[in-house]
Amino acid sequence: MAKDTTGRLHVTVKSGGKRKLSSKLWLERQLNDPYVAQAKRDGFRSRAAYKLREMDDKYHFLKQGQAVVDLGAAPGGWSQIAAKRVGAEAGRGKVIAIDLLEMGEIPGVTFAQLDFLSDDAPEKLRAMLGGGADIVMSDMAANTTGHRKTDQLRIVGLVESAAAFAAEVLNPGGTFLAKVFQSGADATLQAELKRNFATVRHVKPAASRQDSSERYVLAMGFRGG
């Protein structure tokens, strides 16, 4: 261990015989990430919880009594924050967490193991909520191939699919929040969001790693419904 420029201890992971360099770097980054350590202390399932909390602190889109849909929710960091802020734990708001992967129970959160891309997903979601959603949010990231153009197409395609789902289930005035990357929403998606929402902006919370190209698109004031 050694101290970095901030005075924190820095953990260096030794390379094992079978450990790939990428795995070593990932593990080293996790061990030295203050948000990872803080998430464990605060009882959050992932460091991503701080990203949502920070964005909501600034833009105030999560409100008591709202109905929230968390796409690609596992392991549940965003759902934890949403449940607290809309009062789902007290039965005032609702949070539906959707993922293909299983996810452990979270107080106030209803989990649905389904594919949001399936044709009947919007109908199932509305039935679970007893109506539309006030917020659809997605911290999903597409699987990468290492080929920049291919990966960009996958990223944009995933955000477009999430936006299309949101357009089917959001109440008027609703909010859509989704992970994009440095290029942000592409021109076609940006134009679509501007048609459907009163305001569209790109946000990079401080909890996003500085060496990451990760950003979020935040669209508020849904015009449809």
UniProtKB/Swiss-Prot annotation:
Its main location: cytoplasm. It catalyses: uridine(2552) in 23S rRNA + S-adenosyl-L-methionine = 2'-O-methyluridine(2552) in 23S rRNA + S-adenosyl-L-homocysteine + H(+). GO terms for molecular function: rRNA (uridine-2'-O-)-methyltransferase activity. The active site is at 179 (proton acceptor). Pfam families: FtsJ (PF01728). S-adenosyl-L-methionine binds at residues 76, 78, 99, 115, 139. It is found in: Cytoplasm. GO terms for cellular component: cytoplasm. Keywords: Cytoplasm, Methyltransferase, rRNA processing, S-adenosyl-L-methionine, Transferase. InterPro entries: RNA_methyltr_RlmE (IPR050082), RNA_MeTrfase_FtsJ_dom (IPR002877), rRNA-MeTfrase_E (IPR015507), SAM-dependent_MTases_sf (IPR029063). Its EC number is 2.1.1.166. The keyword rRNA processing applies. Belongs to the class I-like SAM-binding methyltransferase superfamily. RNA methyltransferase RlmE family. This is Ribosomal RNA large subunit methyltransferase E. It comes from Afipia carboxidovorans (strain ATCC 49405 / DSM 1227 / KCTC 32145 / OM5) (Oligotropha carboxidovorans).
